[in-house]
């Protein structure tokens, strides 16, 4: 509707899904894109993260990597970088005209103003409630009173809205090198 191209739409959709389907995708995950131009040239964007710089190469006290939680993360989140690289490709080679901030604005609104919780989100949070209740960040947003939001209940994520606003204002690299990186 605003004259953007398919890559710009994919970035905006990905940002919105990070708000509305956090059980399937998110800013803290990996991201991948295959982009074909009008002449059939295909570009690949890989947002597969590397191991964090501060992760010890080997810790003899760790016998098993936990299934969930901060210690289970073995790579740096690559999704935001993939979105940023896709934006740059769109501008450089595909005539992209949308601003980075405009692509994140719908996701900011969803996170700030809320959206109806989905059946899929309810199923997975309910199914994993025991595990998720042990993660204070997840529990504070998605498990009020220890229970998953009901299907259709309005869910707001003000901290995620702030993160998305910061990305919109400062650019995708802030997630890795700026204010957001220092908070992570």
Language model segments and positions:
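Noncatalytic scaffold domains of N-terminal-nucleophile
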Residues: 1-2, 6-170, 175-177, 181-183
